[in-house]
Amino acid sequence: MTRDPIATARTLSEALPYLQRYAGAVVVVKFGGNAMGDEAAMAEFARDIVLMRQVGVNPVVVHGGGPMINELLGKLGIKSEFVRGKRVTDKATVEVVEMVLSGLVNKRIVQAINDQGGRAVGISGKDDDLMVCVADDPDLGFVGKPVEMNVQVLRDLYNAGIIPVVAPVATGMADNETFNVNGDTAAGAIAGALQADRLLLLTDVAGVKDASGEVLSQLTPSQVREMVASGTISGGMIPKTETALAALDEGVRAVVILDGRTPNACLIEIFTDEGAGTIIRSTEPRVKPRVRR
């Protein structure tokens, strides 16, 4: 492929205001969806995260792993049940969830980042009591709702130049209690506790769509609530927007729902005029106005 050096230089030059804007910023990235099962996509994601770290951004990666959990549960003959889009997690299931998230998925992402020249360390919500949970809903079993966040361990890691990679498994208030935490919920809680500049929720859709199916580039919290009430936002997008609104309430400056299958999606969002996906925020000045597609 022939590269245009002038175009490359122009792109780098146009990124300067955003490089300055995000120097030292904390960006929490929820990595999930089909990209997790694609080695090439994971390598590309890892490169983006390493580049963000290299130019002074402090990325914190939180991941899911639903497809891998389903695969192992199937092999073990354990049936999955879902209530309102969340996995019902009994004692046997939570052990499998922890095995997959903390032992398999987490270390794959850590290795992918390290293979790209970064320094990543994998932890779970149990480490240093990062996330302490109570049961989210009696119908869901060991599905946790974070009630205590202890994020100093994350600050210690990124202040040392290390990229934290967090598996959404948490401890409970009682001894020897383990909870499965929805990945988006965990990412939102971590972003709120860190007062992150951005929360990026990578998914398998281009963003939040209007009634005609067009992706909306920007939304305010009140617009999101209206779209949920009208049914325009439905299905799996509801918990994502709920996470976004909760994160904004906790002090996150903006949340972006974007397609993790898009090459360099994180870099496009952070470092270009166009941005990516749907940004949800209260009024906030930009370095300069974005022309969001």
Curated annotation (Swiss-Prot):
| Pathway in which this enzyme or protein is active | Amino-acid biosynthesis; L-arginine biosynthesis; N(2)-acetyl-L-ornithine from L-glutamate: step 2/4
Q: Which keywords label this protein? A: Amino-acid biosynthesis, Arginine biosynthesis, ATP-binding, Cytoplasm, Kinase, Nucleotide-binding, Transferase
EC id: 2.7.2.8
User: What coarse category fits the chief subcellular location reported for this protein?
Assistant: cytoplasm
Molecular-function GO term, any one = ATP binding
The protein's matches in InterPro entries, at most eight in alphabetical order, are given as:
AceGlu_kinase-like_sf, AcgluKinase_fam, ArgB, Asp/Glu/Uridylate_kinase, Glu/AcGlu_kinase, NAGK-C
Residues the record annotates as the site (Transition state stabilizer) are: 30, 240
Enzyme class at the top of the EC tree? transferase
Signal sequence annotation: none
Q: Respond yes or no to whether keyword Kinase is given for this record.
A: yes
Q: Which residues take part in binding substrate?
A: 65-66, 87, 180
Q: One Gene Ontology cellular component annotation?
A: cytoplasm
> What does the entry give for GO biological process?
arginine biosynthetic process via ornithine; L-arginine biosynthetic process
Q: Name one Pfam family in it.
A: AA_kinase
Stored Gene3D superfamilies: Acetylglutamate kinase-like (3.40.1160.10)
* Known catalytic reactions: N-acetyl-L-glutamate + ATP = N-acetyl-L-glutamyl 5-phosphate + ADP
Location in the cell reads: Cytoplasm
Extract the PANTHER family matched here.
N-ACETYLGLUTAMATE SYNTHASE, N-ACETYLGLUTAMATE SYNTHASE, MITOCHONDRIAL
Q: Please give the family membership noted in the entry.
A: Belongs to the acetylglutamate kinase family. ArgB subfamily.
**Could you tell me what this protein does?**
Catalyzes the ATP-dependent phosphorylation of N-acetyl-L-glutamate.
Name this polypeptide is given:
Acetylglutamate kinase
Q: Which organism is it from?
A: Cereibacter sphaeroides (strain ATCC 17023 / DSM 158 / JCM 6121 / CCUG 31486 / LMG 2827 / NBRC 12203 / NCIMB 8253 / ATH 2.4.1.) (Rhodobacter sphaeroides)
What high-level taxonomic lineage is stated for the organism? Bacteria, Pseudomonadati, Pseudomonadota, Alphaproteobacteria, Rhodobacterales
